[in-house]
């Protein structure tokens, strides 16, 4: 429990807020540090052309890109994959231009997980975003990468979250963001930070292109069947199936049709044969600490910069070796967003992941990048989802994944797909490194003012 005294005058600048969460937050201490800056201060609104939330509209979703525009929620803007999102109808979505994002903007989540930031790159541009995303459009007074790195720093996060309000669904507002102080650092410092952020954005764009090329090569080889809703299944088929599955969607689904097509038209190997190991850790007692090892959940592995505020004790966690993520491992959640697949790059390495994340370690029979691209494609997703079980909380398990057929295609195509995935992995890893370096420069500079 935190306690403290506040002066009546300190309530005036914050709209006479009376809740203790505002006045006793970390943002208060950060504002004192920022006030001691050796550089001039200005409100962020002076470094921006606009700070706004975009239009609010009734959402009508469609299934094909011909009639829809990718629509990002506040959580989507933080994801590595910006393509696997809902599509808002072009015809029935009003004020589309007000909802579109542009490259170079700083995006801030304003509800739910408040205060998380993303730097809009070319993959965000021209997509729509919900009203739960604050858009900061920089002008030329401060470098756009510098503004982003400042708000994405731990000090920036404390400032953003201090303005939270609401009893049930909490928010921050553009007017509050506009009022936050930002130091006008020397041009050389701003330039160095901006260069790192811009390079990070460029690498992410190139990485996304490389991965999309790899996945497209897989989808060009195997046609995606149209869904059938009815069909006949013999009792012999049911009795000979894995675990004698009885659900209709196991036998009548895209995954089932794709499986039959692969059996008939390709040489193939079950996923269990082309992996050294497919497993997940056992359930364990978690000891959370302040300065431990980062612990990722099933959703965290898909973030553009995989991270979590949860950290596990290094001394009390007995199964660290089985929880640790190894680079070039394939990660699949066993519940939640089943069918999505992540490639463990430098941003994942040596972090821990929960028992809800299945690990696939490819062997030398097929290239790991090819296996990942296949499982990441619409083809692979349908094959994974075929094995879903559970009526309320749905799951898949390693024994089910081992059955998935992996087509054995020409070595040259496999090698090319693998190289593209490795290119994706290296560029994402470097992008995360650059971004963290830029943010760290901001944090260290601010911390130096208290010494």
Protein language model regions, located:
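Well-ordered mid-protein domain cores that form the structural environment of catalytic cofactors
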Residues: 77, 82, 95, 107-117, ...
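A short beta-sheet element
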Residues: 97, 109-150, 321-323, 333-374
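Non-catalytic DNA-recognition/assembly elements of restriction-modification systems
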Residues: 1-57, 186-282, 410-451
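Short, surface-exposed loop/turn microsegments at beta-strand edges and helix-strand junctions
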Residues: 61-69, 78, 84-87, 99-101, ...
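Sequence-specific dsDNA recognition surfaces
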Residues: 41-60, 75-103, 269-284, 299-327
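A short glycine-rich beta-alpha junction/loop motif
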Residues: 127-134, 166-188, 351-358, 390-415
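Short coil/turn segments at secondary-structure boundaries
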Residues: 57-66, 162-163, 229-233, 283-292, ...
């Amino acid at each position: 429990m935190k306690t403290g005294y506040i002066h009546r005058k300190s309530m005036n600048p914050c709209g006479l807020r009376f809740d203790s969460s505002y006045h006793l937050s970390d943002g208060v201490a950060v504002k004192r540090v920022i006030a001691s800056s050796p550089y001039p201060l200005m409100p962020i609104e002076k470094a921006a052309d606009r700070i706004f939330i975009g239009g609010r509209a009734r959402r009508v979703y469609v299934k094909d890109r011909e009639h829809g525009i990718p629509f990002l929620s506040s959580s989507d803007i933080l994801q590595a994959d910006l393509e696997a999102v809902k599509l808002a109808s072009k015809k029935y979505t009003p004020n589309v231009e007000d909802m579109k994002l542009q490259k170079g903007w700083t995006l801030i989540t304003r509800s739910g997980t408040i205060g998380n930031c993303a730097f809009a790159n070319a993959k965000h541009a021209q997509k729509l975003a919900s009203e739960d995303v604050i858009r900061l459009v920089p002008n030329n007074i401060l470098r756009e990468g510098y503004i982003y790195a400042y708000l994405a720093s731990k000090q920036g996060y404390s400032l953003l979250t201090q303005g939270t309000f609401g009893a049930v669904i909490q928010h921050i507002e553009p007017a509050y963001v506009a009022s936050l102080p930002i130091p006008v650092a020397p041009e050389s410092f701003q330039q160095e930070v901006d260069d790192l952020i811009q390079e990070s954005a460029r690498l992410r764009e190139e990485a996304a292109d490389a991965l999309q090329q790899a996945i497209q090569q897989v989808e060009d080889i195997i046609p995606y069947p149209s869904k059938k809703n009815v069909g006949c299944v013999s009792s012999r088929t049911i009795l000979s199936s894995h675990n004698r599955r009885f659900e209709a969607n196991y036998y009548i689904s895209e995954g089932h049709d794709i499986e039959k097509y692969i059996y008939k038209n390709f040489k193939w190997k079950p996923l269990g044969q082309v992996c050294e190991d497919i497993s997940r850790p056992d359930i364990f007692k978690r000891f959370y600490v302040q300065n431990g090892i980062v612990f990722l959940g099933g959703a965290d592995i898909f973030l553009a910069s995989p991270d979590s505020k949860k950290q596990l004790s290094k001394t009390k966690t007995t199964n660290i070796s089985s929880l640790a993520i190894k680079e070039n491992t394939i990660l699949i959640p066993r519940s939640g967003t089943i069918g999505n697949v992540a490639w463990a790059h430098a941003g994942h390495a040596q972090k821990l992941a929960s028992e809800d994340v299945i690990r696939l370690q490819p062997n030398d029979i097929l290239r790991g990048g090819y296996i990942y691209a296949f499982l990441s494609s619409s083809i692979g997703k349908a094959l994974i989802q075929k094995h879903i079980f559970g009526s309320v909380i749905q799951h898949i398990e390693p024994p089910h994944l081992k059955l998935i057929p992996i087509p054995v295609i020409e070595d040259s195509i496999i090698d090319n797909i693998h190289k593209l995935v490795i290119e994706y992995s290296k560029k994402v890893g470097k992008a995360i490194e650059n971004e963290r370096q830029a943010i760290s420069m901001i944090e260290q500079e601010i911390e130096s003012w208290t010494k």
